[in-house]
Design a protein with these regions (language model features):
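N-terminal membrane topogenic signal
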Residues: 1-6
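Helix-termination/interfacial motifs at the ends of transmembrane alpha-helices
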Residues: 7-23, 127-204
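Large intracellular
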Residues: 14-137, 208-252
């Protein structure tokens, strides 16, 4: 689980509720229907049904764990390269590999698949992964664009109701509540939930894409029978300073 996402969301909502004091006046059924119901339906309208039905699972990824650490992947790739160079590709078959993308690449090596086909297959899968993740983040970005607009629509609805009932003082308060609370709900939904979710999905997608690129280059290096130490230096160039230092230290 991504502790930062959970703590950040709960903390933001808790601070907002604390600032409200009594949350009762900030709850309005009409405003909820306009902003939450309206934005969901509008997002469904601009999305495909499979994308819409899968949004809960995609959102869950924002709160799920992070991809493997790239420096750990480099160390594992170097270990696999050492085994392959010493005992041959077939010796890789019994190795425990938790990363599914790496496991696929190693399985293709063990099967004797042509190097060009291995690279093409892995690169295509990486591209498809990035496309899926981009679509998931795009869904929440689209929803984040719509939510404040629905808040503005609710504000206009509330103002029309208020102006149409100026002769009835009792109707002015509820109408004004709709006008103000829809704007609040739209801003909260977009800026506290949806935009951070989209950004977190993009961050994790970039991290996973980097890992996959490391795997592709590492698997191809193993296929070519390269020196594991040289492979560690080469793959380390993909990382930032601290990650590279950790990888080099682990490699010895």
């Amino acid at each position: 689980m991504d502790i930062a996402s959970v703590v950040g969301l709960i903390g933001a909502l808790a601070l907002i509720v604390m600032a409200m004091g009594d949350p009762g006046p900030f709850v309005d059924t009409a405003s909820i229907l306009i902003v939450f119901g309206g934005s969901i339906m509008a997002t469904l309208y601009r999305s495909t049904l499979p994308e819409f039905l899968g949004f809960a699972g995609v959102m869950g990824k924002a709160f799920g764990g992070y991809p493997d650490k790239p420096d750990d992947l480099i160390v594992q790739l170097a270990e696999l390269a050492t085994i392959a160079r010493k005992d041959g590709m077939i010796a890789l078959e019994g190795q425990e590999i938790k990363n599914k993308f790496l496991a696929k690449g190693i399985a293709m090596l063990v099967d004797g698949t042509d190097g060009k086909l291995i690279r093409t297959s892995l690169e295509r899968e990486n591209d498809q992964m990035k496309s899926r993740h981009a679509a998931g983040a795009g869904f929440f970005e689209a929803w984040a664009e719509i939510a404040p607009a629905m808040g503005m629509i609710g504000t206009l609805v509330g103002l029309v109701l208020m102006l149409g009932n100026m002769s009835d003082p009792k109707a002015i308060g509820p109408a004004m509540a709709v006008a103000l609370l829809t704007t609040l709900y739209g801003a909260l939904l977009a800026n506290v939930i949806l935009i951070p979710c989209a950004m977190k999905l993009k961050t994790k997608s970039s991290m996973e894409a980097l890992n996959n690129e490391l795997v592709i280059e590492g698997v191809m290096f193993i296929n070519d029978g390269g020196n594991p130490r040289i492979m560690g230096d080469m793959l380390g160039s993909f990382l930032d300073g601290k990650q590279r230092e950790r990888a080099m230290a682990a490699l010895g």
